[in-house]
């Protein structure tokens, strides 16, 4: 009888594994479909703007029925909000977790610049920022979610490190600590400028940002 119970136990474990496999596949398909919807939404929002973008066209790009979108997102606004979270929140988490206290302030600034250039300007994330800039005034909730998910998390980190730099004598004035927006202002300028005038007079964002850091901290890279 013990042998039969042992065999029965093995069979039960096998059945559990067999049952789990279809569930895993369904979960993977759901995640793939969700990612496809978000990718299609980004293309539509960039091509048409938030106001003119239609969920019908998002569904067509994602090659799904329109009704499928509502299984994942309540409406177009919630779809856009999730796009912001999905694309930018992990990057924000990386900045929040970075060990910045014991790094020279110029090195901190260069790290932030490099992250912006590689992970935002060099990717489709810059299109999300352009959308926020262009559509935010007409759709305040879109600006609100960007502020909550990105700015309200990153700005205190930067401000705190700049204030520490003032205390330590790394910075002779507290202007940057009071207005940390100054640190990244040229990066946003480059996003807007190259979106509007890049065909005529493109800005080299890396050269622009390092010239800006030289103005703020003196010439030369940190060691």
Identify the meaning behind each predicted range.
Residues 219-223:
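C-terminal effector-binding regulatory domain of bacterial HTH transcription factors
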Residues 144, 166-214:
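Hydrophobic/aromatic-rich alpha-helical bundle segments in the mid-to-C-terminal region
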